[in-house]
Amino acid sequence: MQKNNYKPAKKKHLLLTALTSLILISCAVFTLCVYNRSYNAKALEDIRKADSSTGAPVSPPAISDAGGTDNENGTVNPEGSGNKSSASGELHGVWISFFDYNEKGYTRTSFTREAETMLDKCKADNFSDVFVHVRMFADAMYNSKYFPWSRYSSGKIGKSPGFDPLSIMVTEAHKRGLKIHAWINPYRITKDTTSNSALAKSSYAYKWRNSKSPSLRRNVLNYDGRLYFNPSKTQVQKLIVNGVKEIVKNYDVDGIHFDDYFYPYLGTTYRKNFDAKEYNTYVKKCRNNGTTPASIVTWRRRNVSRLIKNVYSAVKSADKKCVFGISPAGNISNLYLNNNYYCDVKEWMGNPGYIDYICPQIYWSFEHPSCPYKKTLNTWTDIKRHKSVKLYAGLAAYRAGISSKEAKAIGDKGWAKSNTVLKRQIKYAQNTGETSGFIFFDYSDLKRSSARKEINNATKLFK
């Protein structure tokens, strides 16, 4: 047979040929690895340069199984913890903010019509949850014992609209099979004024600010042209917790939600401004007791964490099924600056008793120079997370469909290059196996014609 006609010399030749091919392949693989190391070092250096002004976290590009830099739809599995996504179990949410309300207020009929329109749209776009603003500026879009009626309900702060907007929203959301979360800003009192005229005279903010007691006056702080509740004050913490508790007890909400407004940016004089007076009192007490005081940064973080823990406890004591979560700023390095936020998200994520979920606002495209989407999301998935805490991604629907000029103005050209950014962001997050849902900011962009193609491409994944 032909197979028997091969001579030993020819066999040796074939063996040498095979060995040579193997060596060449090995060299090619080695060269590819060296190239990738070189590429990643260069990319890391570029990121460092881009991040030098933002304080953004630095991490190398993700590497795919194929050996090159991971593409936007590639499968990655960064170190993290459980809570894996599943198409059927994901949360698909949208924020309905005070920007979506009418500042002139509503009648029962006009608000009901508005609520029906909003919720019909959310349902049509395959969302499962709505996050509805109920306290924007120490006010209430519901009948509250602790906070005055919002001007977004009646047109004037402290004036009843004659109906209960939150009650209508809860009823209409549940009619459509949507879950509803009451969204609260805990510390913010005013948007751009320090005038007493912006406060309802019946409000705690007004009474404290105009109190004869110096201690009570310190419950409201005037900073950078705005008014804030003092995060360090016990009366403030109790007020915020009571405001949460009444919502969960009186309304069939599915969740309580805080966003990224905690301590304001305090600048280079952060050691001396805002609640520094209360910190100095704390330091004196520590020294009198023979204990070492925490730094002002740690002290402020503890103030916020104490509130978060107390809110969580209040929510669960009122309704164990009701969830509590937070949507902090997406750049985690900024959260740990010495002069801003004071949000110890690693503490909240890594331990039970603080939150049920975290939803960082990752509002950048894949091409952002300092906080590209993949790198930023991976930073969050890498954080140790308790098994009870879910990770969602907050996505920028408001950047969908923007022009090249607009994208250039915000320093994020990736948004103008395609209408599949949100879709690819969702797929990438799902492929990490670490996220459990997404929330879009915000409702108004579901109606914007220039955003529709991008929104449609993304929300088809929610079916």
Task: Identify the residue ranges that each predicted region occupies.
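Active-site-adjacent "subsite" loops/lids of carbohydrate-active enzymes
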Residues: 86-110, 182, 187-246, 250, ...
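Aromatic- and glycine-enriched glycan-recognition loops and surfaces
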Residues: 107-125, 152-176, 238, 242, ...
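Substrate-binding cleft of secreted/luminal carbohydrate-active enzymes
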Residues: 350-370, 380-463
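Aromatic-lined carbohydrate-binding/catalytic grooves of carbohydrate-active enzymes
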Residues: 125-161
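Short, acidic/polar
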Residues: 105-123, 236-247, 336-353, 373, ...
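The substrate-binding groove and active-site-proximal loops of carbohydrate-active enzymes
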Residues: 99-109, 147-162, 223-238, 292-304, ...
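Catalytic domains of carbohydrate-active enzymes, especially glycoside hydrolases
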Residues: 113-140, 250-254, 351-357, 435
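Polysaccharide-binding and catalytic clefts of secreted carbohydrate-active enzymes
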Residues: 209-331, 336-346, 351, 363-364
